[in-house]
Amino acid sequence: MSHETYHANVRSVSRSMLADFIESPAIYHGRYVAKTLERQSETHAMAMGTLTHCAVLQGERLDSMLAVIPDSLLSEDGGLRTKAAKEWKAAQQAEGKIVVKAHEADNQLADIIGMRDAVLGVSVVTDSGVRVRLREDIFQRHGVAIETPFDWIDTESGFPMRAMPDAMVIIDGNAIVVDVKTIADINRAEFAIADSYWLQVAHYTEGVAAAHGVPTDRCLFLFVFVEKSAPYRTRVMQMSANMKAKALEEWRVAVSQLHDRITRDDWNDWRSGELIVVDRFIKGIQ
């Protein structure tokens, strides 16, 4: 299933939909209920991340993933201004390709190859003492589910839910879920998990438990971060047991709040109409 098809489905609750609700009930209502707001359009950085996933997870030929702009379509300032140029770009993007200029193509390919090779070369020992080689033990393992969506019903809220992990294997009643993230600065990876990626761990862990019968404490979720530029440094991270438990609690709170908002048809934003007193001083220029 393509990413576009997966995200177009709003009949069940995905991790990204729940993230939108946590950010703003008004945004959730606009995108998924009233459908007056469009989803964020794909940026160049997002497209590069998608292509890196294709290279790592699906082994697609890299030369088929980029569309080099013909010189004849470029205007004098180097842009795509004509109707023909814009139609060509739209057609390439509809096929999932990233559009680049000829002088950019080599650099883009080098970065994708660098990130792919860095991720596939990762080997790590988990906190339980098990060595995991991403290429052999996960991505190329017999029975691995690569970007395969699954559905479940959340029994407490009654919501239909869905998830699509990058890669998942179930071995002897234990699940290993791997998610690949590209990042500009590898030193920010830990902050990214604490800030927003905790929701992904909780959502997928709940889904694996409900859809595949794997207890939440037997679902290992590994984030594999890879830097977007040379030397393509990597970090493999997992949440501590305490942080994972907290993430699952916060996930349940968010789902319960979404259920309450739908029941009451109340889409006012968090703290809307409330006077917020700021009590943090930002030091100025000396």
Model-derived features: where do they sit?
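A residue-level signal for conserved active-site and pocket-lining positions in enzyme catalytic cores
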Residues: G49-H53, A167, W251
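Secondary-structure boundary elements
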Residues: E136-Q140, V169-I176, A209-C219
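Hydrophobic/aromatic-lined pockets within catalytic cores
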Residues: V56-R61, D154, T182-D185, A209-G213
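Hydrophobic (often cysteine-bearing) scaffold residues that line and stabilize catalytic clefts
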Residues: H44, M48, Q200, A247
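Short amphipathic alpha-helical face segments that pack within enzyme cores
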Residues: L51, L199-G207
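Metal-dependent nuclease catalytic regions and adjoining charged, substrate-binding loops involved
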Residues: Q92-Q93, K97-H103, F191-D195, E206-Q286
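Non-catalytic protein-protein interaction segments used by genome-maintenance enzymes to assemble
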Residues: G143, F150-W198
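Metal-dependent nuclease catalytic cores that hydrolyze phosphodiester bonds in DNA/RNA
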Residues: M1-R162, S272
